[in-house]
Amino acid sequence: MTISEELFSRAQQHIPGGVNSPVRAFRGVGGAPVFFSKGEGAYLYDEDGKRYIDYVGSWGPMILGHAHPDVRQALERQLANGLGFGAPTRIEIDMAEKVCELVPSIEMVRMVNSGTEATMSAIRLARGFTGRDKIVKFEGCYHGHADSLLVKAGSGALTLGIPDSPGVPASVAEHTLTLTYNDAIMVREVFARHGDEIAAIIVEPVAGNMNCIPPEPGFLETLRAVCDEHGSLLIFDEVMTGFRVALGGAQQVYGVKPDLTTLGKVIGAGLPVGAFGGRRDVMSHIAPLGPVYQAGTLSGNPLAMACGLTMLNKISEPGFYDALAAKTEALAKGLQERAQAAGVPLTINQVGGMFGFFFSEEKKVSRFEQVTRCDLERFRKFYHGMLDKGVYLAPSAYEAGFVSAAHSDEDIQATLDAASSLFASM
């Protein structure tokens, strides 16, 4: 028995399912989860001392790699001055100014402690600003575990086969209209019927919680258009894509400007953090300026602000995203070529430093129903084979992968070599 297996057995005695977030339980791939003790650069080390090339990156935020020296120094400097004050600080202003500088659609921003808090608060704000109740979301998109957003959700909910959760009142769920991602016609039809009741559309501009699904041409533009036509707000959930697919997020890549944006992951450099921001007139409805209440004891905590600001300064350096995209493209193309050579049907999607692969006969995977038809058993075999060879991928066929600046050409090649030997045996 490995140390990870022993720890998992212990964990199940006092932690529900042995984990503090469901997808970590390996239900999507089988077996016991790996327990890690250290991260450094592009690598993770488990409790048995085995090293892995990491393509999870703490589910996205480790864009510089684990334990980057500059981030560690920023954390240590702030630790010397205190962990938190529950009061305003200079560094939260610096952070807000930097976010608004890098994401032009954000004129004002409010810091929170998680992506779920960010999306929950953005929805409340949209409802308060418009005076409407209904929201539109998309099947397979995950926006955290707030009640109104746990309807046909992606991520861990999809992995466990429970995209609708008990405990969500029908009276809450009835205000959530769930449509098909990348179906612009359906969006227009729903707005034709309910447009004057809809407060907002919330969407992952690149759907990263049913693996990695980019928007089809015209889809995001349609969302912008119908919101303008009906007085609804467009919310981009960029918790995953923000500062990950480009410096200005997916809205920069696709040239569509939302009214509100939610952020998380990268902006905390691995520490718990979230944010939501957007148009000044909308954000002015948040207390204490306006009547929509939102608060948090640890919001804007100086540890996360110090690390996040350091992270944003590093990724703002010239050429950072070109290099990151080139590495990710080399990995994606390499996987595709090796699978094809072995006769294994594989479809790859990639946007910037984010990628996803599907064991599927379909040449293009762009809809939720296509994702659910992929070969899960083949994914499980591939996953455990790569794990044995020292490559750590997301333990679910419905989660995206991430490349960091710390991944070297040698890391990419080692990953491709491991995949090639597995494809040959499949």
Curated annotation (Swiss-Prot):
UniProt GO MF annotations: glutamate-1-semialdehyde 2,1-aminomutase activity; pyridoxal phosphate binding; transaminase activity
Cysteine disulfide links: none
Major enzyme class: isomerase
Pfam families: Aminotran_3
Pathways per UniProt: Porphyrin-containing compound metabolism; protoporphyrin-IX biosynthesis; 5-aminolevulinate from L-glutamyl-tRNA(Glu): step 2/2
Needed co-factor(s): pyridoxal 5'-phosphate
Catalytic reactions on record: (S)-4-amino-5-oxopentanoate = 5-aminolevulinate
Modified sites of kind N6-(pyridoxal phosphate)lysine: 265
SUPFAM superfamilies, per the entry: PLP-dependent transferases (SSF53383)
Localization (cell): Cytoplasm
Subunit structure: Homodimer.
UniProt family annotation: Belongs to the class-III pyridoxal-phosphate-dependent aminotransferase family. HemL subfamily.
Record's protein name: Glutamate-1-semialdehyde 2,1-aminomutase
Gene: hemL
